[in-house]
Amino acid sequence: MLPGASIPVVIVADGDEGPAFATVHAGWRGMIAGVAGMAAAELAKGRRLVAAAVGPSIGPCCFAVDEELRRRFEARFPGSAGAETVDLWRCARLDLEAAGVPPGAISVAGRCTASDGRFFSHRRDAGATGRHLGFGVRI
């Protein structure tokens, strides 16, 4: 997975055939569409959802949106929108919980790629960025 400003999500499940995982790359459009929850629901077929992790991405401090987009997020994920920003981490958490991931088993990195200079950020650096690499390995 090569997320830019998008939200990287890893979902883990277990079942009779052994453990399985999914990686999800969710931009704001995918987040509103419920891509994290849809992936979790698909992974849960015949399995039990065990955990999920939300990796570094643009944080609620920096994801400024216009009023129309703020309203769309608030309608889809109550409590996710501030006066001028949206908390995509909260959106991911709510989507995963709704799909059946136990709330206590969802880990959010809490690292904002826009405000933390150790990460690339399209918004912060006006498009002059690289990519982050994320991968999962089943052992």
Q: Residues of each region from the PLM?
A:
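Active-site microenvironment for binding and transforming phosphate-containing groups
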Residues: 1-139
